[in-house]
């Protein structure tokens, strides 16, 4: 087959897989923090340095700027935001296939790895939540950084790395991923060109230290160095690799009558661990949210694809591929989409209520999201309504002559008292 036709066919297949995996999200509404970030995108247009007053959101500059661009084109239409995020995921899957091809020179590994990443449910929050777009953007810039590095375009590698760092702080993982690629290519771990990557890091560190005292995540102990990090790492790693690593290793053993090579296997697990490392200091959960394993999922399916490519029995390959596709697609369609609909329910119901009534003062009790800016910013989607008309009980706001609303957790609706 002509290489151009083959590449086009593969790209179309990847696009189909990405769409098949995440199409259910297209009819979902905005969720929670989405409303706040959409408002901040307007403030960013007016003042480029606004995000530096609410750190660490300055390290989300690329995604918030993108929200503003999408909003200026499509307005408050969530389906277009979700469609764009699915497009980003497709581009990342395609770039990931290029990275696999450059590093392994194996078309089976490149095809299988990219296809598995396209439908793998583990990082679904990065694609199924508009706020998670920071992770898909970071993934895009990290992939571009690594591809430029492998092609010896070191200046562009540093430029992409800079944008990755201002998509999410965790992009610092590049400093470890580049030496791992060098090791995989049997090259010097830290060549002279590595120094150019330290230039965007110097800017990042200067900004990070300058905003340390006002960084909400640090000052409120949302992230903190402590013993909990080890347990977060272990739990997240187990959740990420189960059950597919066990399945593919079992098939490998059955088919080849041996275990995978320890050196490559251990290096792959080590690389997965490194991509999780920047996130594990969170204190609000015993494991990482799914959006934060987006890049780690690439490394993990790289391992799966490497093991898959070595299977000699085509029936076992087909069985694994069919099971992987069916289970992940089913989980995304019938489990995760419903969960995101439920997460969106409070703001979706509030939006419907505002659309059905003329502007008036309201006070909401028991709204499930603790951040009062979330319900207030829903008002931007309805002409005539403003933030000051939406009060939230428990924030010191009160009124004597206003509509009182109560969130009913059982029916998931707003009811008037």
Each model region followed by its residue ranges:
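Polytopic membrane enzymes that build or remodel cell-surface glycoconjugates and lipids
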Residues: 1-417
């Amino acid at each position: 087959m002509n290489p151009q036709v083959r590449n086009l066919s593969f790209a179309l297949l990847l696009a189909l897989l990405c769409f098949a995996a995440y199409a259910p999200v297209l009819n979902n509404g905005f969720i929670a923090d989405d409303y706040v970030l959409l408002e901040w995108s307007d403030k960013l247009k007016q003042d480029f340095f606004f995000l530096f007053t609410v750190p660490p959101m300055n390290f989300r500059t690329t995604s918030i700027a993108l929200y503003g661009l999408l909003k200026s084109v499509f307005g408050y239409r969530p389906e277009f935001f979700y469609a764009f995020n699915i497009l980003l995921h497709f581009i990342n899957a395609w770039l990931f296939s290029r990275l696999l091809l450059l590093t392994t020179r194996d078309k089976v590994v490149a095809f299988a790895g990219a296809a598995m990443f396209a439908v793998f449910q583990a990082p679904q929050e990065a694609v199924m939540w508009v706020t998670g777009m920071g992770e898909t953007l970071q993934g895009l810039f990290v992939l571009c950084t690594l591809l430029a590095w492998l092609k010896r375009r070191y200046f562009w590698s540093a430029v992409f790395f800079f944008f990755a760092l201002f998509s999410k702080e965790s992009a610092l993982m590049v400093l470890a991923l580049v030496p791992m690629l060098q090791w995989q290519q049997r090259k010097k771990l830290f060549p002279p060109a590595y120094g150019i990557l330290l230039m965007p890091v110097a800017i990042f560190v200067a900004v990070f230290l300058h905003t340390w005292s006002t960084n909400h995540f640090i000052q409120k102990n949302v992230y903190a160095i402590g013993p909990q990090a080890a347990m977060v790492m272990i739990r997240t790693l187990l959740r990420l690799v189960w059950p597919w690593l066990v399945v593919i290793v079992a098939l490998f053993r059955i088919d080849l009558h041996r275990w995978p090579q320890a050196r490559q296997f251990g290096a792959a697990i080590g690389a997965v661990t490194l991509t999780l490392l920047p996130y594990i200091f969170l204190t609000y959960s015993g494991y990482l949210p799914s959006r934060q394993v987006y890049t780690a999922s690439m490394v993990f399916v790289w391992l799966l694809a490497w093991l898959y490519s070595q299977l000699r029995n085509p029936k076992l390959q087909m069985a694994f591929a069919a099971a992987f596709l069916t289970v992940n697609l089913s989980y995304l369609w019938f489990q995760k989409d419903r969960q995101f609909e439920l997460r969106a329910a409070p703001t979706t119901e509030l939006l419907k209520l505002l659309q059905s009534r003329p502007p008036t003062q309201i006070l909401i009790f028991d709204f499930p999201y603790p951040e009062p800016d979330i319900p207030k910013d829903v008002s931007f989607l309805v002409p005539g309504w403003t933030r000051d008309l939406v009060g939230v009980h428990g924030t010191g706001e009160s009124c004597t002559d206003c509509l009182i609303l109560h969130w009913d957790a059982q029916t998931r609706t707003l009811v008037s008292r």
